[in-house]
Amino acid sequence: MKKIVLMMLVMVSMSVKMNAQWFVGGGANFGYLKDNFQFALHPQAGYEFNDRWAVGFGLGFSMVSSDVYGYVEPFARFNCWNNDKVFIDVKGRAEFLFGSEDYVAQVGFTPSVRFKINDRWQVYGDAGLFGAEHVGGNWCPAFGFGSIGITTGVIYKF
């Protein structure tokens, strides 16, 4: 019995390994927030376990007027639908900002669309956030598709 369970675990791990891929990429967004210009860069790296699930980590840099902030962002991406060229995803993420006293954290879900250029390259767009954010010492709902909530970028798979 132990041998059968061990063989099954080896087979499952091999199948996961065959479909798994590392990726790097990043995006950018810009817009106006309360009469202030905002620009942000979002580099990221991650690991695709299979056709449906990926996890990753992002480091971001945001500039609002003359203030510069940084953040870290672990995320998990789930592919809801695809046709081998277009992918509709939902990304669960938690963003932790540093360099700001007013805004500390943001958690929630982001809808995303990816377009496959070839086996290595994809372009993507993330739109908005559905969740909560910690602002000024309080948690409040976060919902929106404003210009600063739309990110476009590229992904490269190894």
Question: Where would I find each of the regions flagged by the language model?
Answer:
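Gram-negative (and chloroplast) outer-membrane scaffold detector with strong preference
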Residues: F30, Q44-V123, I155-F158
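Residues that define the transmembrane beta-barrel architecture of outer-membrane proteins
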Residues: W22, F37-L41, V68-V72, Y103-V107, ...
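Sec-dependent N-terminal signal peptides
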Residues: I4-M14
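Transmembrane beta-strand segments of Gram-negative outer membrane beta-barrel proteins
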Residues: A20-Y32
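Surface-exposed strand-loop-strand hairpins of Gram-negative outer-membrane beta-barrel proteins
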Residues: Y32-L41, G137-P141
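Sec/Tat signal peptide C-region and signal peptidase I cleavage site
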Residues: M14-A20
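Membrane-helix boundary connector in multi-pass membrane proteins
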Residues: F115, A132-N138
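Outer-membrane beta-barrel "beta-signal"
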Residues: F23, F115, G144-F158
